[in-house]
């Protein structure tokens, strides 16, 4: 049982590094890992392994803000496996932070992905903006922040806890924890959005999100 668990964890660690290291916008260490550890894994395991990371792969070029063009791969990630990895990490961090197992419901948003569905993409950007606008900034934790760091926000007025996990200083995963016994607050904005009503969400800096 222990060997099976360790084997699965090792495979998940390799899968996660392969997925995350090369995301556009990450730091130099992510780029370095992509061209060393990740490249060796792909060469060793072949095309079948690459297909477990991305499906419908397209090779293209991306031009950064400095006008430098470099090759990238675009495709559909293994969403379910990524979700499972991020959930395991988030629950482990919750236990480490609060000294107890998390019991309740959680929601995970992969901020580093670009979603084909326009509404999902806008909701992602809205959640990102709201966290950026928080006046009380959380403590950033992690022994090796160039590879991974995380930050827990203080519980809001409803008792909901937000967590931001950052890989290679560029790829963020947003997690919301709702412990058992906490009543989910009524959210008029999301109710209107989900009902198909045209909705605007505006911020003090003039940023405006339009839905439907």
Predicted regions mapped to residue ranges:
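N-terminal accessory/assembly segment that mediates macromolecular interactions
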Residues: 16, 28-31
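Short Fe-S-cluster ligation motifs
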Residues: 7, 30-45
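C-terminal, charged low-complexity interaction regions
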Residues: 67-212
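Histidine (H) residue identity feature
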Residues: 5, 33-35, 61, 96, ...
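Short Cys/His-centered divalent metal-binding micro-motifs
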Residues: 2-20
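Short flanking/linker segments adjacent to small metal-binding domains or redox-active Cys/His motifs
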Residues: 38-79
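Intrinsically disordered, low-complexity regulatory regions of eukaryotic proteins
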Residues: 21-26
């Amino acid at each position: 049982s222990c060997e099976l668990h360790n084997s699965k964890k090792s495979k998940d660690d390799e899968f996660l590094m392969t997925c995350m290291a090369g995301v556009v916008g990450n730091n130099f260490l992510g780029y370095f890992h992509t061209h060393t550890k990740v490249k060796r894994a792909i060469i060793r395991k072949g095309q079948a392994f690459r297909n477990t990371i991305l499906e419908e792969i397209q090779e293209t070029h991306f031009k950064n803000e400095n006008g430098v063009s470099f090759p990238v791969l675009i495709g559909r990630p293994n969403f379910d496996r990524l979700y499972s990895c991020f959930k395991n990490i988030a629950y482990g961090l919750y236990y480490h932070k609060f000294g107890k197992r998390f019991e309740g419901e959680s929601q995970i948003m992969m901020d580093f992905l670009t979603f084909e569905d326009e509404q999902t993409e806008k909701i992602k950007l809205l959640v990102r903006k709201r966290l950026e606008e928080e006046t009380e900034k959380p403590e950033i934790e992690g022994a090796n922040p160039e590879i991974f760091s995380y930050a827990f926000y203080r519980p809001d007025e409803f008792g909901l806890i937000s967590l931001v996990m950052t890989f290679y200083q560029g790829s963020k995963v947003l997690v919301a924890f709702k412990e058992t016994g906490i009543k989910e607050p009524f959210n008029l904005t999301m109710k209107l959005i989900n009902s198909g009503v045209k909705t605007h969400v505006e911020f003090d800096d003039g940023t405006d999100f339009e839905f439907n």
